[in-house]
Structures are given as structure tokens and as C-alpha cells.
């Protein structure tokens, strides 16, 4: 659902438009790199595990199918639950 919300043109990619939409939705101005990273961190606290996992790949262009394949690879035991927490993923 979040993917569809930020993939406005439905091309299967979340691009720079993501933060523009976040900016509009949150009434915050995201200008500098530091503000951008702070906005990413704020957003990650609001998202469930699968969407939070997307942060690991923030510089890549992934289709929803590619993202789901990567998530499924790391989701070994239960659907939509990762064993490693996000901090461990950042350090991986």
C-alpha cells in the first residue's frame, strides 16, 4: 500500500518523488542532506518491517517485484517478519 502511494506514476519504481511526496504529506521542508536523512529516519519509524527494510536499498532503483524477491530472501521463518533488526541490516 505504501509502495503504491509513493509510486505515483505506477512505473514500479520509487524515485526522488518519494521525498517530495513525504514533504507534502508531513508539512516539513526537506532541503539539506541532513534534513533529508532526518526525514528518512522519521519515516522509517512509522513504517512496518517490510517498508522499513526498503531503507537498506534507498539508493537503488528497484521494482516492487525485485524488492519483494530480496525481502523474501531475508524473510526465512515467517511472512513479513525479519529476524535481524533494522540496525543489524544497516551494519550488514
From Swiss-Prot:
GO terms for biological process: regulation of long-term synaptic potentiation; regulation of presynaptic cytosolic calcium ion concentration. Residues 18-29 form the EF-hand domain. Keywords: Calcium. PANTHER family: CALBINDIN, CALRETININ. One of its GO terms (molecular function) is calcium ion binding. SUPFAM superfamilies: EF-hand. It comes from the Eukaryota. Belongs to the calbindin family. GO terms for cellular component: cytosol; dendrite; nucleus; terminal bouton. This is Protein 10. Binds calcium. Brain. InterPro entries: Calbindin_Ca-bind (IPR051001), EF-hand-dom_pair (IPR011992), EF_hand_dom (IPR002048).
